[in-house]
Amino acid sequence: MELGLFTCGYQRYPLEQAFEDAGRFGYDYIELWGGYPHAYVEDLSLTGVREVERLVQKYHIPVKCFTPEHNAYPFNYMTGDAFQWVRSMNYLEKAIELTAAMGASKMLFSAGHAGYRMSVQEIDERLQKSLERLVQKAEQQSVTLILEPLTVYESNVITGLNDLERALDKVDSPNLDRKSVV
C-alpha cells in the first residue's frame, strides 16, 4: 500500500513545503490540489507544470493524482445553464490535459450539487453526458478519472457508494476507475 500527501492543507505555504514534508514523513507520492496559489487550473501554465516537475525531481516524490478545485461557481457541471456546463467541461478537460502534462496518471473529481429544481431524471442525464465527455478526454490523454462521492451537505448527486455505483455504471471505460471507490 502506498500513502500520498494531499497538498490542500498546504494552501498557506509554498508548494515546495508539501514536497519537503512528504519526503521527510515518508510519503510515497503527492496528490496535488488544483487550487490557488499552487496549481489552480487556469493559472497552471507551462511554467507552473515545469515548477511541479522541478519539485518532483528535487524531492524524488511523484505527483500521481491531480485534484482540480471545482463544484463551486463557476465550475460546477451539475448546475446552471448550458454556458456554465460548457465552461465547467472546458475547465475539467484542461485539468485532464494538465494531469497528463505533469506526468500524473489519475485525476480525482466529483459531482457538485445539482440544485433543488432538477428532477432525478434530469440529474442522471446531465451526469451521464458530463461523465461521457470527461472520459473521452481522459482516454485521449491516458488519464484515469476517480469519481469521489461527497457529503449530503456538498452534493445531491453522488453522496454514497450506491450513488457512485450507479454513476460508474453509466459509462463503460477503463479510464473511469472502479477500484478506488472504497
Label every model-predicted segment.
Residues M1-A104, E132, E139, S173:
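N-terminal pre-domain/capping segments
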Residues P14-A18, L44-G48, S119, I123-R126, ...:
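Residues at alpha-helix caps and immediate loop-helix transition turns in enzyme cores, especially N-
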Residues Y29, Y36, E125-V182:
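Acidic/histidine-rich catalytic cores of soluble enzymes
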Residues E31, C65-T67, L108, I146, ...:
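Conserved beta-strand positions in the central sheet of alpha/beta enzyme cores
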Residues Y40, R117, S155:
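Glycine/Thr-rich phosphate-binding loops of Rossmann-like dinucleotide-binding domains
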Residues K64-P74, L108-A114, V152-N156:
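Substrate-binding cleft and catalytic face of glycoside hydrolase catalytic domains
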Residues M78-W85, Y116-D124:
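Glycine-rich tight-turn/loop motif centered on a GG-T
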Residues T99-V120, Q141-T151:
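Active-site groove signature of glycoside hydrolases
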